[in-house]
Amino acid sequence: MKGCLATMDKELWIERANDSLVKHFYEQQSGIEQRDGFESKLTFGTAGIRGKFGLGEGRLNKFTIEKLALGLARYLNAQTNNPTIVIHYDIRHLSTEFAQIIANVLANHQITVYLPDTYKTTPELSFAVRNLNTAAGIMITASHNPKDYNGIKVYGSDGAQLSTDASELASRYIEEVGDPLQIDIPISKQNTSYIKPFPKSVTDDYMKHIQNMIGYIPKSDLQVVFTSLHGTSVPIVPELLQSLNFNQFNLVEAQCKPDPNFSSVQSANPEDHRAFDQAVELANKSHADLLISTDPDADRLGIAECDAHGHITYFNGNQIGALLLNYRIQQTSQLRHRLMIQSIVSSELTKSLARYNNVEYKEVLTGFKFIAQEIRQLDDHQNMIFAFEESYGFLSEPFVRDKDAVQIVPLIIKYASELKLYGKTLKDALEQIYQTVGRHEDTLFSHTLEGLEGKKKINAIMTKFRSNPPQEIQGLKVKAIEDYLTSEVYQLDKDTTSQINSPKSNVIRVLFDEGFIALRPSGTEPKIKLYVSLKCPNFDDVAQKINAMIFS
């Protein structure tokens, strides 16, 4: 009987394919991909919804977007009277159409919607929620995922992504909607009157906040190459740099045009060195010093340097974090009670740098919403000077409550310009940090373990560390094991257990005098990540051996 119902559901979806907005994507998919759309179901989690286009409840299409929007409308109306919301969207396939669908559904429920007539960045959405004092915000993006993906991120009234509790409540409202094929969305002129143009003044205010943060960029002969990887950071980043009287940059023209197919990049992820390929070519032609890329929704950023011989130095997320923290420490020397926030899988390097400079630091779970929660809880006398995650997400000043590559681009250019005046580079600055606090190094191993056997292996690895914690790993003596699922930390040398004041998450962190390793399974994919952050000789060899020991 279940198989018959599934077949009937599939037939109903195929009958509605012409109205789904995604027929073209569905027809290009393999049989397995098509079937997965009918046999799976999109779920609204702490990061919203993200998935492929296609037919069925397991795919993004007109009907699943209407279901999401209807659930969110009921959620918002239950939370506040006369709610308002701002919607932004990126350059991906169907982002504009999904934005209009969501706006129509919300308007149908007497929710005032601010909707721009062009694409915007994710940090602009966070800022707009705060600037317009709306009850919520919606960002339509799939960040750096492949071209056949999109997603919906939901933000609360503070401009941060929804908390875990709020996400769970919104999810219940969405699930209560039921079958997306049975939704009827009447549209009338009265309802569409709730949809308002997005005020240009908000973008102007956002630019002013960044201009005030930067002040000025010193005159030097620094040359920059910038690529938006076909995303949303053009035109806002070039306009911002010009407003700061910095014009010594060249755009990778082929990649600075919005393109939902990401035609000229192998990867639209600034973590991936391949994302810089065309930027490197242009840097060599233009004798540029600094290369900067932002991901498609402009919340994350990567950098590289080109020396006089054309040699490229790529910086990982932890190294960029250390450079930016170092610069912010220099900029804020007059402030007392300075604070830096980072995720629990980010580097020991930045913590050592903070300690050396008498800057307090806090560690939070992975996910920038946890950083935003810390910012919200700051005392009046505390000054948050920097926050970051090792996955290339940075925030300098909290007028935005999410990762913000747009505010970081001029900040890193200003730092590089100052260094250039003294004949120094960012690589030199990083080396100076190492000389000051020690050469803490970091790497990440990501393992995909498919199927039931893969799931069993991931569970076995986590269980082993929980039930039989090692005394040492590759000659490194274990001091403590932090288990964020049980919210406990076990001190091996003292044989004591204490509580961790943190939300629960399936993460284990093993602490040594030399640093830490962390294990973090994905909640949505058959993946597990191993983070290694150590100050030790032969780091690369030690990291490889730790990885082999755990996953052999």
Curated annotation (Swiss-Prot):
Pathway: Glycolipid metabolism; diglucosyl-diacylglycerol biosynthesis. The active site is at residue 143. Mg(2+) binds at residues 143, 295, 297, 299. It comes from the Bacteria. GO terms for molecular function: magnesium ion binding; phosphoglucomutase activity; phosphopentomutase activity. It catalyses: alpha-D-glucose 1-phosphate = alpha-D-glucose 6-phosphate. Its EC number is 5.4.2.2. Binds 1 Mg(2+) ion per subunit. GO terms for biological process: enterobacterial common antigen biosynthetic process; glucose metabolic process; purine ribonucleoside salvage. CDD domains: PGM2. The keyword NAD does not apply. Keywords: Carbohydrate metabolism, Glucose metabolism, Isomerase, Magnesium, Metal-binding, Phosphoprotein. Catalyzes the interconversion between glucose-6-phosphate and alpha-glucose-1-phosphate. This is the first step in the biosynthesis of diglucosyl-diacylglycerol (Glc2-DAG), i.e. the predominant glycolipid found in the S.aureus membrane, which is also used as a membrane anchor for lipoteichoic acid (LTA). PANTHER family: PHOSPHOGLUCOMUTASE 2B-RELATED (PTHR45745:SF1), PHOSPHOMANNOMUTASE 45A (PTHR45745). This is Phosphoglucomutase. The lineage of its organism: Bacteria, Bacillati, Bacillota, Bacilli, Bacillales.
